[in-house]
């Protein structure tokens, strides 16, 4: 992934504008100019969509809550994605990361302050609370802004040890340190509230949405009093098993990190000068001590996450009492058929007997029961299907959905993506994250995931329409394209089943999921 950082300043004399009276406009050079609360920015126009990238929304010292960015003079050029939060991954060059300059967001809009109040959709990237960025091509907001006449926003924020290290034992100055990564997102939402009208958006109609870790962040925001009133609808995609830490565990982990570095709580200020890689090393050692050996394949920084401290974050998301501060928020939630499961679709000649032999290693004498329940849920199953179904995300989603409707009367919709990608000879199934390019209507930007079949484009058109309609009205129904999408109830489990033929299903897999992972 290649990111460009360009924070050049253009003098006012070149543009011939007065900062004090700068209304949104387009220069003779086709540069859209907007005055924000912190300064004037210029962007670009891409196929009729006004685009601003790398817009500063905050600044912060290490482990401190975010503050407003310093105001700037002149016009700040915002035409390239900003730096990425510090993280250790193989697919992002470290030169593209910056601990100080990561606090930026991106905006795509069809018009600037034209009197219309467009719905705003703010995307939170995946990667747990550990990795990721807002600059993934498949989450480019142009297609949604163009198709749905909405304002799209995406945001970078602090991650892993820099975003979620609990130093509360070191004094009141650090009492919020365990949650500063999420407070960054709250700060971005405040920026939206204060500025989005200049970009043609409605600050009173903001939908937050995200997948995987991004979905977990959506659920976390729903439990944060500071975020109350800053968003009005929410979409959680494959995010209901992203748990935060208890206050006791996060505090113990923070002290373990200090111990690894040979620093006492009284010497906490020394953390400000320790290189990031040394912090990560100490963090990994501390996680090992607190959690035990890292499971093979789990993220390096697995263990740093927000802390349910009862103040910044009231409780564990997706547990009883979930989102008591946002019971009035319309919500949409869903998963994919296979998620992160290793699939057997490449084994074209797999027989039912061979599949059953493997299943017996998992279910023993209950294997026939599993197959019977699977057949009830998916009558047209193949032997490969039996070995490939998600057994983690879907059960948690059903459990969360049941609790949500018991505790909230706000509209609540559930979806399930069963459509299998045609890439790699259809061997990947309906995998984790496949709903992202479909919901963004970005098949052309992620053909290595979706393929380029007519079915992929058709489904992307339908799903993106549903996401857009939900952002506009709180109702995802797409008249003439989908059967009626009813709100979820425990009794019927109404779920929109996205496939080559879309349909509304009713508790189609509840018994199967309860067998795999008891839903109570």
What are these regions (language model features)?
Residues 18-21:
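C-terminal motif of bacterial Sec signal peptides marking the signal peptidase cleavage site
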Residues 23-179, 203, 300, 340, ...:
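Non-catalytic accessory segments of hydrolases
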Residues 55, 395-520:
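Mobile gating loops/cap/lid regions near enzyme active sites that modulate substrate access
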Residues 91, 194, 228, 237-355, ...:
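Substrate-access "cap/lid" subdomains that shape
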Residues 102, 175-197, 255-256:
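Alpha/beta-hydrolase active-site loop
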Residues 126, 180-184, 212-215:
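Active-site loop->helix "elbow" adjoining a glycine-rich segment at hydrolase catalytic centers
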Residues 199-211:
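Alpha/beta-hydrolase fold nucleophile elbow
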Residues 215-227:
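Short glycine-enriched nucleophile-adjacent loop
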